[in-house]
């Protein structure tokens, strides 16, 4: 199930980033250190009362150039409208209600999404003298917090999770393959979608998604049911030059959250860009199936080695998604377009595949015989047995004697052996290490 998205919105200097960091806690550093993922602290994974959600810091989207504050706020509010399931509207409890706050509230009201008015910088147990001013906004009871001191955060998060509605982010049946078309602007995502939804497809209906210009389009291909989650509408916003890249990434986050399989579209004339790495990294982190689609292949001058050289470049630049199949296509000419849905279906099946425990342990045992487990100071790693815990992504529990003895390189070796024997093309694999003694 996709995680709900919570956006932190507010005019500059009301403490959005402080609140973001307080809610996200140490998770930010974990996200930052993973390969291919943005270091701009635009998003973080958070959890409260067993609810997992994605936190978006719209403060990180603000352009650096000197612009009129209401214009900046309009962009923030638009971003919240398009991506969030719940909006935290941060205001300054010391300063009171301002005209900019009123303008932002008016924009947020139009979203018809849950908005929680949050008075920050209330650093004492005494109520802000401006508390009742915020009832003028007509957005329910304000919540007082101090992000810097951590006061009231629990009450705020209680209110946030109360507003989660599973129907908002889990619209489709389990047998529908949800496909997100992701990638930086101007790589041909819209053209690819038009090709996929050609006359030979049966378009069921158009359902407005959680993003305003992204349309979720269900369709069938034979007996298979799909829904395409389109983020191509980001190109229409290209006038926001200062923040276009960050904006694109946030839009991709919303699409990835809803998807089973991501199509990472790369422009053949540009190769792999930094933004491609960031978007691919987010999909990988979230355990989504992945197909790399190299578009505009028709305009590339080729010889017998061109495709192999391009594959090598992609593998070198996107090492952490080496499992993803690569398809070279042209939306303009229709070249190899039939391969896309073939790979999507295959990857979706691989992402949901279960391996019998007996077969899994046989492969693990043979792998250990071929390449002895590491040791340290006379103590050798022992893998007692393995079992598959879940799918989407495939997740395996390894019961071992000592976690400290499991080197990253050896875990990668075991992963490669599992892939060699069972496949899992196009999907990340997760491992959970659990210690037990031989007597357990």
Curated annotation (Swiss-Prot):
GO terms for molecular function: GTP binding; ribosome binding. Residues 4-168, 177-352 form the EngA-type G domain. It holds the Pfam family MMR_HSR1. Coiled coil: none annotated. The keyword Repeat applies. PANTHER family: GTPASE DER (PTHR43834:SF6). Belongs to the TRAFAC class TrmE-Era-EngA-EngB-Septin-like GTPase superfamily. EngA (Der) GTPase family. Associates with the 50S ribosomal subunit. This is GTPase Der. It comes from Alkaliphilus oremlandii (strain OhILAs) (Clostridium oremlandii (strain OhILAs)).
């Amino acid at each position: 199930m996709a995680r709900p998205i919570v956006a932190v919105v507010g005019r500059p200097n009301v403490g959005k980033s402080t609140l973001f960091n307080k809610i996200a806690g140490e998770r930010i550093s974990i996200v930052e250190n993973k390969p291919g993922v943005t270091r701009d602290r635009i998003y973080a994974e958070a959890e409260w009362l067993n609810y997992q959600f994605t936190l978006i810091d719209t403060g990180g989207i603000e352009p650096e150039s000197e612009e009129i504050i209401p214009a900046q706020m309009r962009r923030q509010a638009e971003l919240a409208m398009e991506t969030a399931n719940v909006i935290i509207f941060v205001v300054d409890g010391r300063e009171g209600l301002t005209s900019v706050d009123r303008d932002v509230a008016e924009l947020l009201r139009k979203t018809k999404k849950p908005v929680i008015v949050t008075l920050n910088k209330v650093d004492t147990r005494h109520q802000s003298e401006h508390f009742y001013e915020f009832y003028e906004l007509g957005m329910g009871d304000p919540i007082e917090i101090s992000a810097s001191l951590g006061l009231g955060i629990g009450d705020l998060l209680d209110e946030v999770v109360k507003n989660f509605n599973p129907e908002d982010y889990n619209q489709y049946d389990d047998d529908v393959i949800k496909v997100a078309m992701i990638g930086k602007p101007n790589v041909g995502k819209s053209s690819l979608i038009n090709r996929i939804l050609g006359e030979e497809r049966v378009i069921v209906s158009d359902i407005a998604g959680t993003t305003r210009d992204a349309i979720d389009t269900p369709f069938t291909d034979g007996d298979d049911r799909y829904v395409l989650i389109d983020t191509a509408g980001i190109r229409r916003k290209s006038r926001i030059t200062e923040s276009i890249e960050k904006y694109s990434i946030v839009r991709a986050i919303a699409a990835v959250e809803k998807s089973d399989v991501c199509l990472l579209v790369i422009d053949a004339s540009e190769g792999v860009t930094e933004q491609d790495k960031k978007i691919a990294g987010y999909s990988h982190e979230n355990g989504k199936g992945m197909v790399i689609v190299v578009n505009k292949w028709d305009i590339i001058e080729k010889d017998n080695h061109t495709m192999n050289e391009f594959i090598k470049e992609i593998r070198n630049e996107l090492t952490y998604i080496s499992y993803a199949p690569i398809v070279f296509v042209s939306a303009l000419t229709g070249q190899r377009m039939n391969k896309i849905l073939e790979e999507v279906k295959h990857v979706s099946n691989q992402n949901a595949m279960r391996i019998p425990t007996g077969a899994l342990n046989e492969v693990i045992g043979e792998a250990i015989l071929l390449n002895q487990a590491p040791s340290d100071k006379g103590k050798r790693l022992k893998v007692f047995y393995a079992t598959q815990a879940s799918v989407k992504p495939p997740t395996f529990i390894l019961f071992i004697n000592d976690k400290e003895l499991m080197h990253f390189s050896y875990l990668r070796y075991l992963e490669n052996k599992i892939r060699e024997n069972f496949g899992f093309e196009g999907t990340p694999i997760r491992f959970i290490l659990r210690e037990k003694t031989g007597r357990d």
